[in-house]
A protein has these predicted regions:
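Bacterial N-terminal signal peptides that target proteins for export
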Residues: 1-11
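Acidic, glycine-rich flexible loop segments
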Residues: 115-148
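Mid-length scaffold segments of soluble, non-membrane domains
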Residues: 79-128
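Primarily secretory-pathway and cell-envelope proteins
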Residues: 22-84, 135-176
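Bacterial N-terminal signal peptides
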Residues: 9-19
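Conserved short hydrophobic patches within well-ordered secondary structure
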Residues: 2, 112-115, 162-163
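Exposed boundary/loop context
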Residues: 14-16, 63, 98
Length: 176
């Protein structure tokens, strides 16, 4: 009888420890930076709507962050050739966020946006009607040895990311 109780207690202890270990590993899972090859066309569309038109995306120039809770931030360059010069000057990319973000110190609600890096060293974020939501200072990395057209890399602190278009970048993070 004691032997059965001991085995039962040991089994329950093992199951409890295993379930706590699984819960701990779920908590410790990390955000994943996505490159273009990691983003299927079912996640990031081939064409996006902006200012009354649809424009093709450049899938080879997309990137994103897949957060540990399953939510995404995806961004990429677009072909803005059909747009007016004033819009083309600032509409270079498309951002899709499932979570609130902080970009360059500015709060951004979940949604879809146009963005670009413009003269004067600024990053501009626009709503789908091409209205500027804000402009913030961007960083230009003249020392970058081999710039690529578009990428997202880890920022200087945990949970921050740098969105690069060529040598220009802006820092973003998931907002609280």
């Amino acid at each position: 009888m004691r032997f059965r109780v001991s085995i039962l207690a040991a089994s329950l202890s093992f199951l409890l420890a295993a379930s706590l270990g699984i819960a701990q590993s779920v908590k410790e899972s990390k955000d994943t930076i996505l490159k273009a090859a990691d983003i299927p066309s079912t996640l990031y569309p081939e064409r996006v709507f902006f200012r009354g038109k649809t424009a093709p995306t450049q899938h080879r120039n997309t990137a994103g962050v897949h957060f540990a809770d399953g939510m995404y931030v995806l961004a990429g360059l677009v072909d803005s050739s059909g747009y007016a010069t004033s819009i083309k000057a600032k509409y270079q990319g498309y951002l899709i966020a499932e979570v609130p973000l902080e970009i360059g110190g500015q709060h951004v609600n979940p949604g879809a946006y146009g963005f670009g890096f413009i003269q004067g060293g600024k990053f501009v974020l626009m709503d789908l009607g091409a209205h500027d939501l804000f402009q913030v200072d961007a960083h230009h990395d003249a020392a970058m040895p081999h710039p690529v057209p578009f990428q997202i890399i880890a920022g200087s602190s945990a949970g921050t990311y740098l969105l690069f278009s060529g040598r220009n970048s802006i820092e973003f993070k998931r907002a609280e």
